[in-house]
UniProtKB/Swiss-Prot annotation:
Glycans are attached at N39. Residues 56-95 are annotated as: Disordered. One of its GO terms (cellular component) is extracellular space. Transmembrane segments: none annotated. This is Agouti-signaling protein. Keywords: Disulfide bond, Glycoprotein, Knottin, Secreted, Signal. PANTHER family: AGOUTI RELATED (PTHR16551), AGOUTI-SIGNALING PROTEIN (PTHR16551:SF1). GO terms for biological process: hormone-mediated signaling pathway; melanin biosynthetic process; melanosome organization. Involved in the regulation of melanogenesis. The binding of ASP to MC1R precludes alpha-MSH initiated signaling and thus blocks production of cAMP, leading to a down-regulation of eumelanogenesis (brown/black pigment) and thus increasing synthesis of pheomelanin (yellow/red pigment). InterPro entries: Agouti, Agouti_dom, Agouti_dom_sf. The presence of a 'disulfide through disulfide knot' structurally defines this protein as a knottin.
């Protein structure tokens, strides 16, 4: 009995370590020192060298002026025209917003509203979800 419990405990501990090791992120896994040295030396050689060029005051002013000229047209946008949408007239027998609208009832009066049912279609009401419709 004790041997089987010891075997089960050992198996459980091994499974815990196995699951913990398999869920480690790739960068957290232990690496070889040789792999680290090879990767770091290759990465440095892959990138081209960078040359630093000093700008004089005149070129700075020109580039600043060019940037301001580019910004000005982008800021001036044509204002959005609010086009009044003509809504269709509501149907003659209709249900007002927030009133009960069970399926045999007529449609909602507001064209942007729809009949929303809850609790297995026991409580239905006309609702407007998009006020800018």
């Amino acid at each position: 009995m004790d041997v089987s419990r010891l075997l089960l405990a050992t198996l459980l501990v091994c499974l815990c370590f196995l699951t913990a090791y398999s869920h480690l992120a790739p960068e957290e896994k232990p690496r070889d020192e040789r792999n680290l040295k090879n990767n770091s030396s290759m990465n440095l050689l892959d990138f081209p060298s960078v040359s630093i060029v000093a700008l004089n005051k005149k070129s700075k002013k020109i580039s600043r002026n060019e940037a301001e000229k580019k910004k000005r047209p982008s800021k001036r946008k044509a204002p959005m025209k609010n086009v009044a949408r003509t809504r269709p007239p509501p149907p003659t027998p209709c249900v007002a917003t927030r009133d009960s609208c069970k399926p045999p009832a007529p449609a909602c009066c507001d064209p942007c509203a729809f009949c929303q049912c809850r609790f297995f279609r026991s409580a239905c009401s006309c609702r407007v979800l998009n006020p800018t419709c």
